[in-house]
Amino acid sequence: MIQKHCFECGTALIEKELEEEGIVPYCPKCQQYRFPMYNVAVSMIVVDEETGKILLIQQYGKPSYILVAGYVNRGEAEEHAVVREVREEIGLEVKYLRFNRTKFFEPSNTLMCNFTAFVRTAKVLHINHEVDRCKWFTPQEARENIRPNSLAAEFLNAYLDEVGNKPMEM
């Protein structure tokens, strides 16, 4: 998604060279460069700290499993968004977390920040209205059940490749 108008005054942006940046959108009225705006979201590989199992969810009537994820609120740190989203969507408390990687997701104009969120398993999960179903998987089962060719699969597989299918060993 490319901005066409200034977010301050609404004037049509032009392309203008900026030293060491290349061509950047520019507002001739405000006389300011307008760098691209995008969303920021977090996705989490939720790991049971005792068993090493990974929680995957299904959402919005879709049959495929994905990672828990959500948008970062304005002014909110990504780490706080991880804790908030895990608590809101599945009712678990994050004991500790680990940053994994980021990747820009073009379809939603979103920078995705992936973390591993280690939790203590609750006997009953309290899923909210955003989650249809959730299930614990071994690392290998998680690889097999995550939505194929998705960013969630890319994050999960990269993480498991790094830790050798042993999520508790960092």
What residues fall within each predicted segment?
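Charged phosphate-binding loop/patch that engages nucleotide di/tri-phosphates or the phosphate backbone
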Residues: 154, 158-170
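Short, intrinsically disordered, charge-biased short linear motifs at domain edges
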Residues: 6-18
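Conserved beta-strand and immediately adjacent loop positions that scaffold enzyme active sites
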Residues: 5, 43, 53, 114, ...
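Conserved N-terminal beta-strand and adjoining loop/helix that marks the start
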Residues: 11, 22-23, 28-54, 71
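Residues immediately within or flanking Cys/His clusters that coordinate Zn2+
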Residues: 3-5, 24
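Short glycine/serine/proline-enriched coil/turn segments at secondary-structure junctions
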Residues: 36, 64, 106-109
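Unchanged
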Residues: 72-97, 101-155
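Conserved Nudix-box catalytic region and its N-terminal flanking loop in Nudix hydrolases
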Residues: 47-88
